[in-house]
From Swiss-Prot:
Family of the protein in this entry: Belongs to the bacterial histone-like protein family.
Gene Ontology cellular component list: chromosome; cytosol
SUPFAM superfamilies found in the cross-reference section: IHF-like DNA-binding proteins
Name this protein carries in UniProt: Integration host factor subunit beta
CDD domains: IHF_B
An example Gene Ontology molecular-function term: structural constituent of chromatin
Keywords of the record: DNA recombination, DNA-binding, Transcription, Transcription regulation, Translation regulation
Function: This protein is one of the two subunits of integration host factor, a specific DNA-binding protein that functions in genetic recombination as well as in transcriptional and translational control.
Name of encoding gene: ihfB
Keyword DNA-binding: yes
Subunit structure and binding partners: Heterodimer of an alpha and a beta chain.
Length: 94
């Protein structure tokens, strides 16, 4: 599901809200989540999961085109850990 598909679905379910209000709410939520992670904090949504940053150590990679070794710097990457309820729902649906 894309962001625009999410907005469309929410608009269909929340008929008392305008499309602009729904779009603004979704954008605000995503912006707050991004800025929270940017500041190094963790996000926990009970029953859904948590978002945090994981550090990837520096390593030697390879250029897939040439095969040359490339030094890759360490970096932080967003990580999502699903909550118990979400894991159970996904497993029941498969």
């Amino acid at each position: 599901m894309t962001k625009s598909e999410l907005i469309e679905r929410l608009c269909a379910e929340q008929t008392h809200l305008s499309a602009k209000e729904v779009e603004d709410a979704v954008k605000d939520i995503l912006e707050h989540m991004a800025s929270t992670l940017e500041s190094g904090d963790r996000i926990e949504i009970r029953g859904f999961g948590s978002f945090s940053l994981h550090y990837r150590e520096p390593r030697v990679g390879r250029n897939p085109k040439t095969g040359d070794k490339v030094e890759l710097e360490g970096k932080y990457v967003p990580h999502f850990k699903p909550g118990k309820e979400l894991r159970e729902r996904v497993n029941l649906g498969s």
